[in-house]
Amino acid sequence: MGVNAVHWFRKGLRLHDNPALKECIQGADTIRCVYILDPWFAGSSNVGINRWRFLLQCLEDLDANLRKLNSRLLVIRGQPADVFPRLFKEWNITKLSIEYDSEPFGKERDAAIKKLATEAGVEVIVRISHTLYDLDKIIELNGGQPPLTYKRFQTLISKMEPLEIPVETITSEVIEKCTTPLSDDHDEKYGVPSLEELGFDTDGLSSAVWPGGETEALTRLERHLERRAWVANFERPRMNANSLLASPTGLSPYLRFGCLSCRLFYFKLTDLYKKVKKNSSPPLSLYGQLLWREFFYTAATNNPRFDKMEGNPICVQIPWDKNPEALAKWAEGRTGFPWIDAIMTQLRQEGWIHHLARHAVACFLTGSDLWISWEEGMKVFEELLLDADWSINAGSWMWLSCSSFFQQFFHCYCPVGFGRRTDPNGDYIRRYLPVLRGFPAKYIYDPWNAPEGIQKVAKCLIGVNYPKPMVNHAEASRLNIERMKQIYQQLSRYRGLGLLASVPSNPNGNGGLMGYTPGENIPNCSSSGSCSQGSGILHYAHGDSQQAHLLKQGSSSMGHGLSNGKRPSQEEDTQSIGPKVQRQSTN
């Protein structure tokens, strides 16, 4: 009997830098590449049509690239635990390869499949390629706990072995004599389904702004690297109106689905930097979003409650309000704040928004204006974002709601001033909220302040054609910052730089604007919500070592006062980061 191999695609939807697939092919007589699609999951999961379309395009592109190698992708309907025992027998499988999945659900699923494979006498190959590092080694290096500050994470990875370079792309030379048995009815049995087959109504669906697939990902990577000046000077692009629109060099959805290898991206950046900088070593900051991605993956890998507040040992237990009506207005872009509504409209239409736009709407939903749980916002992003990733999505929402990783709760974005500073003319608003197109720039961010005559000329009456603001931002943010301050004052084991003592008694005294970037002057929101230029921002730079040492489960456990406010020593900073609590049972 020959060696019959199966590679199971989940993420990692690519032929470049795919070590599990490459090893599976070696020594095999036949290779079948499968993707398992659960039809029930397609109809019931919290995933919107844009992300499903992106996934199906990824699968179509993967199938097209496999065809060039005289192979095909086999899309199989069912659940893995039901599908594999049948395939092992039907195809006489002797070898199965998978990319390592670091998320708790994925680890549990893969453990079950490995058990079934072992019982069937099938060898299982598991290789890491969705992350840069072996996350378990990072945790081991940190004494068995995930690092909960980015500074500590950077310290740990600086001690790791150098990254392995990407493996060679799967080509006809790599496959050699390894063949894929194909049937005449392949497309009927194993073809990539359409959105309609999955039950989606595609009437009115606009063309994809982000085409899925490895081919597109590699094209975008080359465009991204053409920005040699950015790499040479390592300047973060300045935020402007064009930044808010989808870029032909954007990569985040491709990294999320594994159409693009994070290692390939890392080494391409490194090589280009060394060419431009004449072989000098690149700073860690060059890899920005790649390392934040690793940070959140590491924090989440052993925490199945990472996407929940309750039972999550690293999450502050905040008594958020339940307000389904307000949540719906936020999610559907009906808040009455054009900046917020334009962002949520772009998200729903295209499946992507700029990272600072994500910050703005997350702040508005949680600690700044609506006081609604980050879990609710996370679910909306999970549905609508192309690049929604369990670990990163949950981690980002905990961070932006000051529930973990970051506790500078007296920062919030003005839903008028931040947009006006970014795009003074309001072109972004006009693009996604055409109902407001007729307003002059002076009023487009706060149209409720426009005189009635201007509203009539714009053919948009506030409260009739476009909603009035759902909250008074200045008042809501002042009250919510005070609520957050009181919660943090109750945390029994907070260790920082006397952070709470430095919060002004009226942190919103400048009218509702809390700054995000130190050293800038940005528009000030008045109590009416209008903006005026020139107010300074409040910014307290407390360094990474203030990660709160989070507490027992539930608000009832909040304890007995603050720390002494002294800065931790450098030794404490590097050795004592992370929660000192036992994980609660999830039963």
UniProtKB/Swiss-Prot annotation:
A motif (LIR 2) lies at residues 82-87. A motif (LIR 6) lies at residues 285-290. Coiled coil: none annotated. A motif (LIR 1) lies at residues 50-54. It comes from the Eukaryota. There is a cross-link at residues 11, 107, 159, 329, 485 (Glycyl lysine isopeptide (Lys-Gly) (interchain with G-Cter in ubiquitin)). Residues 554-587 are annotated as: Disordered. A motif (LIR 4) lies at residues 255-260. GO terms for molecular function: DNA binding; FAD binding; photoreceptor activity. The LIR motifs (LC3-interacting region) 3 and 5 are required for its interaction with MAP1LC3B and for its autophagy-mediated degradation. This is Cryptochrome-1. It comes from Spalax judaei.
